[in-house]
């Protein structure tokens, strides 16, 4: 569905939740969801096709940690999932870094997410995790106050600027717009231009339709692997995934 930061009434997970409620209705098309709908099936089929046609040899057999070192080998044409925390290892001079030139300038470029045939204006177009600080009511008041002071220090302008300069993860708009990053922008492969553009607004986090992220997230990789292995077709896989998601949410 259309809607930012998440679609209403159906979000990017394909989970339906009627407006004005906090209870998910379901993920299966039969329950008004979209996890096994045409758009989701198309996305999984296209991912499988691209993996087979364009990924480096052996990529399909890699796990998450094996895939990370391969990025700096220079044998990857396009990456569809990326943690900004890893950007620092992809920039700068290093004999083992094959994705920068002799001057340390990136040979890659970050860009907005591509649009599929089912995407419409007003829908989100990408995903990014959003961090937060949680202060428990059960914690002693004085300790909560200390934690609150530390949190303010950790996200202050000066500290945020330094952390972003080293790790290339941003928590403040002022950091993104700082003159220091205007100077560094050419060596960061489009990262600064992206976060200064409106494109960042359609990269939104998981929304309130997802009642139990850990339980539901683990279902995804288990089922998606069955497409890659050829055990099930994309439609069969998404049907099975939608059924299991509804079972978890019931």
Language model regions located:
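Periplasmic solute-binding protein
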Residues: 1-28, 122-136, 215-225
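Glycine-centered hinge/linker elements that transmit conformational signals in sensory
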Residues: 2-61, 113
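Second-shell loop/turn segments in exported
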Residues: 29-34, 137, 206, 227-229
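Extracytoplasmic/periplasmic substrate-binding proteins
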Residues: 38-143
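Short amphipathic alpha-helical coupling segments at ligand-binding clamshell hinges
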Residues: 42-46, 141-154, 216, 233-240
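Sec-exported extracytoplasmic/periplasmic mature domains
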Residues: 48-56, 72, 76, 91-94, ...
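Bilobed periplasmic-binding protein/Venus flytrap-like ligand-binding cleft at the lobe interface
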Residues: 76-77, 130-169
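Long, aromatic- and glycine/proline-rich binding clefts that accommodate carbohydrate-like moieties
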Residues: 106-115, 164-222, 226
């Amino acid at each position: 569905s259309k809607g930012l930061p998440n679609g209403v009434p159906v979000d990017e997970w394909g989970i339906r939740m009627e407006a004005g409620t906090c209870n998910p209705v379901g993920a299966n098309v039969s329950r008004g969801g979209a996890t096994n709908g045409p758009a989701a099936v198309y996305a999984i089929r296209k991912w499988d096709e691209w993996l087979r046609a364009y990924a480096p040899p052996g990529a399909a057999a890699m796990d998450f940690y094996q895939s990370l070192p391969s990025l700096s080998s220079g044998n990857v044409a396009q990456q569809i999932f990326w943690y900004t925390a890893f950007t620092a290892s992809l920039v700068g001079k290093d004999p083992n870094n094959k994705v920068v030139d002799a001057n340390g300038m990136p040979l890659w470029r970050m860009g907005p997410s591509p649009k599929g045939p089912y995407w419409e204006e007003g829908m989100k177009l990408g995903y990014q995790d959003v961090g937060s600080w949680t202060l428990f009511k059960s914690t002693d008041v004085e300790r909560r106050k200390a934690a609150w002071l530390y949190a303010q220090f950790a996200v202050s302008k000066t500290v945020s600027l330094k952390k972003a300069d080293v790790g290339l993860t941003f928590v403040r708009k002022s950091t993104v717009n700082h003159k220091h990053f205007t100077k560094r922008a050419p060596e960061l492969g489009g990262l600064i231009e992206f976060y200064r553009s409106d494109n960042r607004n359609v990269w939104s986090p998981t929304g309130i339709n997802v009642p139990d992220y850990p339980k539901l997230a683990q279902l995804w990789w288990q089922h998606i692997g069955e497409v890659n292995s050829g055990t099930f077709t994309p439609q069969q896989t998404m049907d099975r995934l939608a059924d299991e998601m509804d079972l978890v949410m019931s």
